[in-house]
């Protein structure tokens, strides 16, 4: 198992304190790290920080761009969901099954749409109800046609029937992302009317049904997947990666909580290293530095590992963001267009699988793959994913905003669609060959033709967290998230004053 296994599974299975007055306000946002920090370690152990956070006026400088990206990304989830069951396609416009992780991001997007005025609270309430009612159907045994078992769901479902797609696995991380969205809705929809009360009840039932203990095939770790045909797969969730949110929810469960030793086991495989001037926990694709932060505000709170390092996980993601930008500026492999405003490697689509000669140099390219760059691993074929940079907006707005603007200027309509940023582009790949996805634009390279739900999700959520902290503030009030963080040993900041 391990972080590498996480990347492999994701690729193969599917293929600072901010202040705001609410949506639409035009005010100066001082994006700085939270003041509440653990004491710094001794000078000899003190890691080199990323450049100090800059004062960035999000609304005055980039309000229209953020509005445009946020609204179009919201429309991916709102317009493409199946109105009968709430399922959201894994990708579009290519024909697609549903991704349960994308459904979790959709559940997170709907309240954002309410606060931004895209839809009414009643419209969002009804959409969430449709979705949660579908998932709350009995899912006790892995029967043919079922969506899940033991409170967990299959990675991909048929968009129309909701049945398991082909032979995909019951997925712990994808169920986790779905449950995170459900718990966000549970806390957000807090009014006494019958519909909102039902949302709270359904989310409660779904979360309580998740049998985390059954997944401890190699205790105290949690397995990544299981199928009735082959049983548990070979990988467990070991850090550092997107599995943080999984263990927070597994530890916070009121019915089937894993022991606190699970967090210690998860963090035992952490790798702290230096990469392009930054010292931080290594994980190559940026999605692993985003996903848990969509729902959990890690500013100013730390577990035992981070207390020893003298930072928090928010700062860690900030450093990972700067390191990836540093890698793109250095551009050791000579990919076209890489630079201070064109950067960002993550799991995403790509042009083709195979080796090709480009301008006299042999190059290897991938289709969907967990791209990334770190001291631990570099997997890079010249393909940039907009979600990689945009998902880091709360961490490093001073470098993310120029990247967003550059992607708009440089790529224009070739990278931006009705539903926001297309998934990826590769300026180096300019060959006229048959492609699975996307197209080659002469003089500009390859551009994807699809948006992917699990890449659109962090875009809308992290833009909103940077602008208003909506998801963070809401989830600070969720008792299960609070309990999970405390059982993992987190202290400090907002967590110390959260209700017990």
How should these model regions be labeled?
Residues 27-28:
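Sec-dependent signal peptide hydrophobic core
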């Amino acid at each position: 198992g391990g972080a590498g296994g996480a990347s492999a599974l994701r690729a193969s299975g599917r293929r600072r304190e901010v202040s705001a007055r609410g949506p639409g306000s035009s005010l100066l946002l001082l994006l700085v790290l939270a003041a509440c920090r653990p004491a710094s370690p001794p000078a000899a152990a003190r890691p080199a920080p990323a450049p100090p956070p800059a004062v960035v006026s999000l609304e005055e400088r980039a309000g229209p761009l953020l509005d445009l990206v946020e609204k179009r990304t919201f429309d991916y989830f709102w317009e493409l969901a199946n109105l009968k069951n709430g399922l959201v396609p894994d990708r579009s416009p290519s024909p697609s099954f549903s991704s349960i992780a994308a459904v979790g991001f959709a559940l997170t997007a709907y309240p954002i749409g309410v606060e931004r005025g895209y839809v009414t609270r009643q419209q969002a309430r009804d959409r969430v109800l449709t979705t949660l009612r579908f998932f709350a159907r009995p899912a006790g045994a892995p029967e043919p046609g079922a969506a899940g078992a033991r409170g967990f769901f299959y990675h991909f479902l048929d968009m129309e029937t909701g049945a398991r797609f082909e032979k995909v696995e019951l997925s712990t991380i994808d169920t986790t992302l779905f449950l995170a969205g459900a718990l966000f809705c549970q806390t957000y929809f807090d009014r006494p009317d019958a519909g909102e009360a039902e949302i709270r009840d359904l989310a409660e039932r779904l979360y309580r049904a998740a049998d985390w203990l059954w997944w401890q095939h190699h205790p105290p770790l949690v397995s990544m997947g299981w199928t009735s045909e082959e049983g548990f797969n070979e990988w467990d969730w070991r850090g550092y990666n997107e599995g943080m949110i999984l263990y927070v929810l597994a530890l916070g469960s009121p019915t089937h909580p894993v022991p606190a030793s699970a967090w210690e086991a998860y963090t035992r495989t952490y790798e702290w290293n230096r990469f392009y001037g930054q010292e931080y926990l290594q994980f190559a694709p940026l999605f692993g530095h985003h996903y848990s932060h969509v729902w959990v505000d890690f500013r100013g709170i730390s577990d035992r590992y981070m207390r020893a390092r003298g930072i928090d996980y928010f700062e860690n993601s900030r450093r990972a963001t700067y390191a990836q930008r540093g890698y793109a500026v250095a551009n050791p492999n000579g990919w076209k267009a890489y630079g201070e405003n064109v950067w960002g490697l993550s799991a995403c689509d790509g042009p083709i699988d195979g080796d090709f000669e480009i301008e006299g140099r042999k190059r290897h390219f991938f289709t969907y793959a967990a791209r990334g760059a770190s001291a631990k691993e570099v997997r890079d074929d010249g393909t940039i994913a907009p979600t990689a940079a945009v998902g880091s907006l709360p961490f490093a707005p001073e470098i993310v905003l120029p990247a967003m603007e550059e992607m708009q200027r440089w790529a224009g309509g070739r990278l931006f669609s009705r539903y926001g940023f297309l998934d990826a582009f590769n300026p180096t790949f300019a060959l006229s060959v048959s492609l699975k996805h996307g197209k080659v634009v002469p003089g500009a390279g390859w551009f994807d033709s699809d948006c992917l739900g699990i890449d659109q999700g962090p875009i809308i959520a992290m833009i909103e967290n940077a602008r208003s902290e909506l998801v963070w503030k809401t989830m600070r009030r969720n008792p299960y998230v609070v309990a999970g963080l405390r059982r993992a040993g987190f202290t400090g900041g907002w967590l110390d004053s959260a209700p017990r």
